[in-house]
Structures are given as C-alpha cells and as structure tokens.
Amino acid sequence: MVLLRPELPTDAAAVRELHRVAFGDHGEVVAGLVDDLRADDRAVGLVAEDAGAVLGHVLLVPGLLDAPRRLVPVYTLSPLAVLPGSQRRGTGSALVRAGLQEMAARGVPVVFLEGDPAFYRRLGFVAGADHGFRRPSLRIPEPAFQAALLPAYEPWMTGTHVYAETFWRHDAVGLRDPDA
C-alpha cells in the first residue's frame, strides 16, 4: 500500500536516486536541483513510499508573484517524479493533490508549475495566462505555464511569476534551444 508522507532528511539519498532515474538524461541535473532547493526551510517535500521504498517525490518551493499591488508569496511545484516502474498508477496525481492541500492549509494563494497541461489540468491547474499571470521566462511554452488557484487567491493577484533563485542558478527554467 502506498503511503504519502512528508519528506524526511533520511530520505535524501532515495529521493536523489529517484530523480536521477526518473529524469533519464537530465537526472543528475534535476537531482542536484532538488538537493539545493530543499536547503530552503520553507520548501515542502512529500514522498510516496511502499514497503519502506520511496516511489515518488514532489517538491513545492517558495517563489513570488510580482503583482501590481505588491509582491505575493506563492509556491512553485517542481519537480515531480515517480519511479518509471510505478508510473501511471496514480502516485504522481496523489502527490500533487497532497501538495496542493498542504499549500491551501498554509494560506498560499497560487501554486505555479511548468508541465504537461493534459496531466496537470486534471488536478486543478489552469493556463496561467488565463488569469493574468506572466511566465518567468519566454523559454517556457505558454501552454506549459500553469497555476492552481487556492482559496487564499484574490482576483487582484496578477503579474509575473518569479522563480526562486536556485532554479535560475541551475538553468532549470524553461527549455533551451540548442539551435538558437
């Protein structure tokens, strides 16, 4: 039976290996990103485990919304990983839902991500541009830039999503064009 729970410091090695395997050619980069992102004590990591083995992980990291009225503390859901042999069984969806519940309980108004709209829209995410949100980088394809509006969201909260500095340091924002 799969159990969802907060990530513990003792999970670090298993979570690192999970991201390394799940992200294939980009696994080392993503694993290093996770190592650095979790250094922020406001980051929220959740794991899915079965019989003591970590099968999935999601990380929610503080960011900002640069709204006309003021800066708004928000979160970014990134990354999400499930072991390849455990995918398509609802583990990733369960981790995302649990993460959104935790963010709502903390009074976070919006959670942003860049990802597959077909997957994340089923979990309550909407196109960011539809609510006046701007991508932090033009390298993020418009359809991939998504937001989950939580109960603390107010309509005046529009503007540019600002990733945590760690994403920029790892060059993990949007897609690079090798032919540019």
Residue ranges, per PLM feature:
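A short beta-loop-alpha structural element at the N-terminal edge
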Residues: V2-V15
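Active-site rim helix/loop that mediates acceptor-substrate recognition in acyltransferases
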Residues: A12, R20-D66
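Hydrophobic pocket/interface hotspot
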Residues: V15, H19, Y120
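Short loop segments at secondary-structure junctions
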Residues: A51-G52, G85, L149-Y153
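Conserved acetyl-CoA binding element of GNAT-fold acetyltransferases
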Residues: R70-P84
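Conserved active-site alpha-helix within GNAT-family acetyltransferase domains
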Residues: A105-P109, G115-P141
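C-terminal "cap" of GNAT-fold acetyltransferases
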Residues: R134-D179
